[in-house]
Structure formats: C-alpha cells, structure tokens
Amino acid sequence: IGRTKEANEEIDGDERPETSHLTRVDLKEDGKGLKIVRQSLPYGTASGTHGLYFCAYCARLHNIEQQLLSMFGDTDGKRDAMLRFTKPVTGGYYFAPSLDKLMAL
C-alpha cells in the first residue's frame, strides 16, 4: 500500500514499490501534486457484506482521471497492488458547480 505495517507510516517515495497504492495515486505534473480531497467510510461486517465507500473531490476532473489511469496500469502497465485485494463494484462522476456558475444560469 505504501505504508509500514507496524507504525502505518508512509514509506519514502524512493523506497516504495512502483505498484504501491501511494505510488500509483501520489502523482505530480510539472513538479506539482494533483490535489484531491478524499474521504472513505467502511461498512458492513467481516463475515457478511462489507466494503468501503470512497468519495473524492477536486477542482479538475483531470486529477482523478489521472489517478485512475495510473491505478489500472493505463499509463505504464503497472497496476496498483491494492487491486489484488479489492473489487471495485461501482462508481460515478458528479459535477458540483460553484455559486458563480449557478448564478450565471
């Protein structure tokens, strides 16, 4: 995943495997990080239906698209190792316009 198991500390970028989740989603363009705000919430029980609700927000759709392309190996053929243990079931993109955009309608 890109963190130590013992202390849950982030592994330095040079030492992280190329397929770690952090390596696949901690992307930079022109030296600047592709910023997103993310929140996740686990649901269910260990013995029953269970999973993780994940929501991300960003100013540009490009940021999330690049992360997804990287996770699924479309950029360099290396897939996020987390995908060996998880199963994406559904997803969606939603546009939340600014107040200025709404007022201009």
Regions found by a protein language model. Give the residues of each.
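Long, histidine/aromatic-enriched segments associated with O2/redox biology
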Residues: 1-105
